[in-house]
C-alpha cells in the first residue's frame, strides 16, 4: 500500500472516531441535563425519542413490573399487525365465548354468543380498556388464551423486549394459581416505538376521548386524561391495579417531533400524569425544526448520463424536508444518495431516478425522491458505445 493510500485510510478512520466521540459527548450532555432534574415520584420512568431510539431520561427503567392494562398494548399491536398483513380482516366477526362473558374488571359487558367485528373490539380494547374485548380478540386470533399469550411472548422477543413476560392478554391481577405479567418501562417504550412504526392506525383509537359501543347503548370513555390535559397527546394506554400502582405509556407530538414517556408504579393518577407531563415538556424543549433540504434544491450537479446527448445532468430534491431534531444532533445528519448513478437516457425532466436519504446515527429519519433537472435526449451511436464500455 502506497504512502498516500495509507494516509487516506488513516484520515478516514480518524474522522469516524472523532464523529463517534462527538455523538457520544452530545448524548452525554443531554443525559446530564436530565439528570440534574429531580427524581420522579414514580418507581420507574423513561423518555424515548422513537425516531432515533435515543433514551433521553430513565429512572429504574429496566426493572420488570406489573403493567396492568398496559399489557393490552401488545394485544392491540398483534391484532392490528395481523389485519395489516392480511391474516385477518378488520371486519371479521368475533363470537363471544362463555369465558369472555365472565371476565371482570374494566369491560364493555360482552355476552355469550354476541358477535362483534375486530374493529369494534379493538376500539373497546383501546378506549374503554375492556378486558373482555382483549380475551375475545385473543381467542379469535390464536384459538385460545394460552396460544395468544405464547404469541405475545414471541413478539416480545422479536422486539428485543428482554425484560418482559406475559401471562395474559389483558393485564388483570393474577389469580392465586397464576403469575403476574411483568414488563419494564424500557420494554414498554420499545413496544410503543413498534406501534408507532408498524401499526400507527392504533393512534386513531388511542387518541379518542370517548366513543359509542353497541350503536350508542354504551359510551366508552378513555382513562388517559393526558389526551385533554397535554397538547399533542394521542395515546397510548394507562394501567392500574393495587399491586401495580398507577402507570401510563404516553406519546405526544409537537412541531413534528414525537416522544414516548412511560411511568410505572406511581402513587396516584395525578402524580403519574404530572410526572409524564414534566418529562414530555422537558424533552420537547430540546427540539428545534430543521430544514434538511429545499424543494428543487440541487443535490448533485453532474450525475453521469449513459446513452444521452449530454454526459451529465443535475438531480434535484423533489420535496422540501423539515424534521424536528434535538438541537445537539441537528448538525450530525448525513445525506445519502441512492440511485441516479448513472442515469439512463432518454428520460424526462422531473422523472424520478433515485432517493435522497437523511441518516442520523445509522438510522434513516427522512427521505425524498430525486428527480431530473432537464429532459435527457437519447444520444447517437458514440454515446451508446460509451455506455457499453463504461461512462
Positions of predicted regions on the chain:
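Active-site-adjacent loops and short helices of periplasmic peptidoglycan-processing enzymes
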Residues: 34-200
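Domain-terminus/edge residues, biased toward the C-terminal soluble/receptor-binding domains
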Residues: 165, 179-391
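Serine/proline-rich low-complexity intrinsically disordered segments, especially terminal tails, linkers
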Residues: 13-14, 26, 33-35
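Bacterial N-terminal signal peptides
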Residues: 20-29
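Bacterial N-terminal signal peptides that target proteins for export
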Residues: 5-21
Amino acid at each position: 500500500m502506497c504512502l498516500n493510500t495509507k494516509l487516506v485510510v488513516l484520515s478516514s478512520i480518524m474522522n469516524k472516531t472523532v464523529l463517534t466521540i462527538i455523538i457520544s459527548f452530545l448524548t452525554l450532555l443531554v443525559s446530564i441535563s436530565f439528570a440534574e432534574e429531580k427524581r420522579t415520584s414514580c418507581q420507574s420512568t423513561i423518555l424515548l425519542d422513537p425516531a432515533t431510539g435515543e433514551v433521553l431520561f430513565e429512572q429504574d427503567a429496566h426493572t420488570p413490573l406489573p403493567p396492568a392494562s398496559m399489557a393490552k398494548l401488545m394485544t392491540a399491536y398483534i391484532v392490528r399487525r395481523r389485519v395489516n398483513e392480511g391474516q385477518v380482516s378488520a371486519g371479521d366477526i368475533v363470537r363471544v365465548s362463555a369465558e369472555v362473558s365472565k371476565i371482570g374488571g374494566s369491560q364493555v359487558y360482552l355476552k355469550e354468543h354476541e358477535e362483534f367485528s375486530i374493529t369494534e373490539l379493538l376500539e373497546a380494547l383501546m378506549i374503554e380498556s375492556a378486558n373482555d374485548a382483549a380475551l375475545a380478540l385473543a381467542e379469535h386470533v390464536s384459538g385460545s388464551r394460552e396460544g395468544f399469550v405464547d404469541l405475545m411472548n414471541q413478539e416480545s422477543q422479536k422486539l428485543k423486549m428482554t425484560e418482559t413476560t406475559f401471562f395474559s392478554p389483558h393485564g388483570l391481577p393474577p389469580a392465586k394459581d397464576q403469575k403476574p405479567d411483568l414488563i419494564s418501562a424500557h420494554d414498554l417504550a420499545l413496544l410503543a416505538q413498534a406501534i408507532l412504526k408498524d401499526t400507527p392506525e392504533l393512534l386513531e383509537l388511542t387518541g379518542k376521548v370517548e366513543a359509542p359501543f353497541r350503536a350508542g347503548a354504551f359510551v366508552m370513555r378513555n382513562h388517559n386524561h393526558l389526551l385533554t390535559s397535554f397538547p399533542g397527546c394521542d395515546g397510548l394506554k394507562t394501567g392500574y391495579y393495587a399491586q401495580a400502582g398507577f402507570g401510563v405509556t404516553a406519546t405526544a407530538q409537537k412541531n413534528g417531533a414525537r416522544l414516548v414517556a412511560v411511568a410505572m408504579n406511581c402513587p396516584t393518577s395525578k402524580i403519574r400524569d404530572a410526572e409524564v407531563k414534566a418529562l414530555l415538556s422537558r424533552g420537547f424543549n430540546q427540539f428545534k425544526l430543521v430544514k434538511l433540504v429545499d424543494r428543487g434544491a440541487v443535490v448533485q450537479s453532474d450525475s453521469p448520463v449513459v446513452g444521452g446527448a449530454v454526459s451529465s445532468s443535475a438531480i434535484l430534491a423533489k420535496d422540501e424536508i423539515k424534521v424536528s431534531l434535538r438541537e445537539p444532533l441537528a448538525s450530525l445528519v448525513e445525506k445519502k444518495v441512492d440511485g441516479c448513478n448513472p442515469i439512463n437516457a432518454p428520460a424526462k425532466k422531473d422523472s424520478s431516478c433515485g432517493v435522497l436519504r437523511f441518516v442520523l446515527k445509522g438510522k434513516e429519519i427522512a427521505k425524498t425522491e430525486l428527480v431530473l433537472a432537464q429532459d435527457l435526449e437519447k444520444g447517437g451511436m458514440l454515446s451508446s458505445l460509451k455506455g457499453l464500455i463504461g461512462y
